[in-house]
């Protein structure tokens, strides 16, 4: 990357700015610039797109996205220690990198979105990644403001995102993701690619919006999945008792003796629409 974009190696940047990844912020810096390019390429063509990035840290992934020709990157970073390193990248790519200091969970990404295609590419902080994904999945209006999500998670979370019925990893997250998006796991990233190395393998997942997901009220689907998977080993007649139990299941045409992990996304939507 240094040869490609003319910027110093990331290890030098981190040392010069005294940056150490902080566990409280869910940080693990990705220093392998071949990997950051691979992540950016997973999002497809970037030339016409504005990219949202969360938690850029010292900017390894940011640099890859810009070097691959993204029209603009809007990066949200709450760690003020990283801002000088990101400012150097902004100077190197005039007018193409905007850094917003703040908490991504409190950021209205849709309000920040300019005209044209939007893609979200991020090595998400482990402690907020799942909540950010759910926020992006559950706007009332659909299709969403974004064209695709290319995100890094702990592998266990990635497996939950892409899981479908009769899979041990299947749960509320798999239903919400499968309802509104097409999902795939792109590739794994070993712990040694990060500083400091996490204790687990990470994985990159890619999600694209379904044009016409099954009509279903977001709040009702959340209620049903939360109740069903809250007691996932119990029969649905028992786990869904607070929502109507057997009466609800009969109305939806679903056998009350089944368990949550056997239901397809379509059947969960049937239940939500029967509330």
UniProtKB/Swiss-Prot annotation:
Cellular component, GO annotation: cytosol
Top-level taxon of the source organism: Bacteria
SUPFAM superfamilies assigned: S-adenosyl-L-methionine-dependent methyltransferases
The entry's keywords: Cytoplasm, Methyltransferase, RNA-binding, rRNA processing, S-adenosyl-L-methionine, Transferase
Disulfide bonds: none
Residues annotated for S-adenosyl-L-methionine binding in this entry: 28, 30, 55, 77, 103, 123
InterPro entries: KsgA/Erm (IPR001737), rRNA_Ade_diMease-like_C (IPR023165), rRNA_Ade_Mease_Trfase_CS (IPR020596), rRNA_Ade_methylase_Trfase_N (IPR020598), rRNA_adenine_dimethylase (IPR011530), SAM-dependent_MTases_sf (IPR029063)
CDD domains reported in the protein's UniProt record: AdoMet_MTases (cd02440)
Catalytic activity as recorded in UniProt: adenosine(1518)/adenosine(1519) in 16S rRNA + 4 S-adenosyl-L-methionine = N(6)-dimethyladenosine(1518)/N(6)-dimethyladenosine(1519) in 16S rRNA + 4 S-adenosyl-L-homocysteine + 4 H(+)
Subcellular location(s) of the protein: Cytoplasm
EC number: 2.1.1.182
HAMAP family noted in UniProt: 16SrRNA_methyltr_A (MF_00607)
Family statement drawn from the similarity comment of this UniProt entry: Belongs to the class I-like SAM-binding methyltransferase superfamily. rRNA adenine N(6)-methyltransferase family. RsmA subfamily.
Its job: Specifically dimethylates two adjacent adenosines (A1518 and A1519) in the loop of a conserved hairpin near the 3'-end of 16S rRNA in the 30S particle. May play a critical role in biogenesis of 30S subunits.
Protein name as it appears in the record: Ribosomal RNA small subunit methyltransferase A
Species of the source: Rhizobium leguminosarum bv. trifolii (strain WSM2304)
Gene from which this protein is expressed: rsmA
């Amino acid at each position: 990357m240094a040869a490609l974009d003319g910027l110093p190696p990331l290890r030098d940047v981190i040392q010069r700015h005294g940056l150490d990844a902080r566990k409280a912020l869910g940080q693990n810096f990705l220093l392998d610039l071949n990997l950051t390019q691979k992540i950016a390429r997973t999002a497809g063509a970037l030339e016409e797109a504005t990219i949202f990035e969360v938690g850029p840290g010292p900017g390894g992934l940011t640099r890859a996205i810009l070097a691959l020709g993204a029209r603009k990157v809007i990066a949200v970073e709450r760690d003020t220690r990283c801002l000088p390193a990101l400012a150097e990248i902004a100077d190197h790519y005039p007018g193409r990198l905007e850094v917003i200091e703040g908490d991504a969970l409190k950021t209205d990404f849709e309000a920040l979105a300019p005209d044209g295609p939007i893609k979200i590419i991020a090595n998400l902080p482990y402690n907020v990644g799942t909540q950010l994904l759910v926020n992006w999945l559950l706007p009332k209006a659909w299709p969403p403001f974004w064209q695709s999500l290319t995100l890094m998670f702990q592998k266990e979370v990635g497996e939950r995102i892409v899981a479908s019925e009769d899979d041990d990893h299947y749960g509320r997250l798999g239903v919400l993701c499968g309802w509104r998006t097409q999902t795939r796991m792109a590739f794994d990233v070993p712990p040694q690619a990060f500083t400091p190395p996490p204790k687990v393998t990470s994985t990159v997942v890619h999600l694209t919006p379904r044009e016409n997901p099954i009509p279903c009220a977001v709040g009702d689907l959340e209620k049903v999945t939360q109740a069903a998977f809250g007691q996932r080993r119990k029969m649905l007649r028992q786990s869904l008792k607070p929502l109507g139990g057997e009466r609800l299941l009969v109305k939806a045409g679903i056998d009350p003796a089944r368990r949550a992990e056997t239901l397809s996304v379509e059947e969960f939507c049937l239940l939500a629409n029967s509330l």
